[in-house]
Amino acid sequence: MRVLHVVTAFPRVRGDVITPWLVELIKRQRAQGDDVDVFTSSYRGLGDQVFDGIPVYRFRYFLRRWENLTHEETAPDRMRRSLLYRMLPLWFVTAGMFAIWRHCRRHRYDVIHVHWPVPLALLGWAAQRAGPAGLVTTVYGVEVRWVKHGLRFLKGFLAWAARRSDRVVAISADTARELREIVDVPIEVIPYTTSLPDTAAVALPQPTHGPVLFVGRLVERKGVAHLVEAVARLGDQGPSLEIIGDGPERPGLQARAAALGIADRVVFRGQVTTEELQRSYARAAVFVLPSVLDARGDTEGLGVVLLEAMNYGTPVVASRIGGIPDIVEDGISGLLVPAGDSAALAAALGRVIADPALARRLGEAGRQRVRERFSWDAIIKRWKEVYRAATKGP
């Protein structure tokens, strides 16, 4: 089967941390015999390339100097920087529609798979104008929350995109539920996952030792400020906090830790190697994903870092928000707390750290859940079924 994935951005070089789960999905689809390409935007004039064995076709949309609406940060974040960037989406979409139409006239596909339908549903429409192909649309959640939290004019567009798709897929049950409030169409739920190393030789963490661990970009929706406050609530004899990742909120978080008197117990490690990250997961007493709803209405679509931590048998505590409950069963494979409630978060952390038996039980159950529900074999099988259904029509 010939498949074209349509995305806003895709890795340019090794080490480019852009949609790693999608890269892995495509590599595995190709390994199983499918002919899979990527269609995405250029970055400062970058042309077509082969990335990790994957053919990547890039379209130009503006002058090289300003051709950076994507890749370095999200397009909405970039658009806040200047009037020029707020105008660029028009050029981006127009150029993309013409480019994908030309591309699909030369290269025939069985399935056009659009990720993030706002605005890429327009590129999917243009691709189908070039020749018959099934259209699959994946909704990650942020598009739906834009509609719910201020951008009401997008409601009709998102409904149109869903109705004209042969198959619609959401990455979590929460995203599917929110999308059904906008448009009444059948929606599959297929989570994304990550490549999980074999940890059979890695000892399960000692629950009463090691730091509290967070991994992710330091932005508002990750809720790290509430985690810092929760650690402070655990008192002078509380655990240390290890923060891996970087982002615009780092200076404020460092200042907050100092103001709470725990600067000596909060370690900001920035970016680390894969090997260092794996060691951090394995030695952590508990992993925390304290996500919240940010000012733009965005939150955690799924929370793939939870899968990474659970793979090591590390107990997890996370917010009950977005797609997180699809991964963590409260009281079974982890603990869930109300988003933004640092007191509840502190209580959950204290409970796990003080009870080694609970920590081990949660860790073992989490590890089993990852193996059963989020394996690549299961997810690839689901996508094959969706693609076959899309090519057969309604």
Identify the role of each PLM range.
Residues 254-276:
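Nucleotide-activated donor-binding/catalytic signature segment of Leloir-type glycosyltransferases, i.e.
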Residues 4, 194, 203-231, 242, ...:
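Conserved donor-binding/catalytic core segment of Leloir-type glycosyltransferases
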Residues 282-297, 314:
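Acidic donor-binding loop of glycosyltransferase active sites
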